[in-house]
Amino acid sequence: MFEQLRTIITKYVEVKEEHITLDSRFMEDLGFTSFDFMSMLGELEDEFDIEVNEQEAATIRTVGEAASYLEKLTSE
């Protein structure tokens, strides 16, 4: 899940995959805007055939939290 998420992240910000870690924060470390983040969530919904809860997604700060959330949604 982490590797797939890392690849998708690089579509939204100019960061090399190898610089993205589980502890990377979307806004502070990777330079995401709110629009970037919401756009990425839409792509994740399409890619993994899931439905992201916007209130839950608003609490996600790091790549690791996003990966855990995606794993939870894809296992339901």
Pin down the residues of each PLM region.
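Two-component histidine kinase catalytic core, primarily the HATPase_c
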Residues: 36
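Phosphopantetheine-dependent thiolation modules in NRPS/PKS and related acyl-activating systems
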Residues: 1-32, 41-42, 47-76
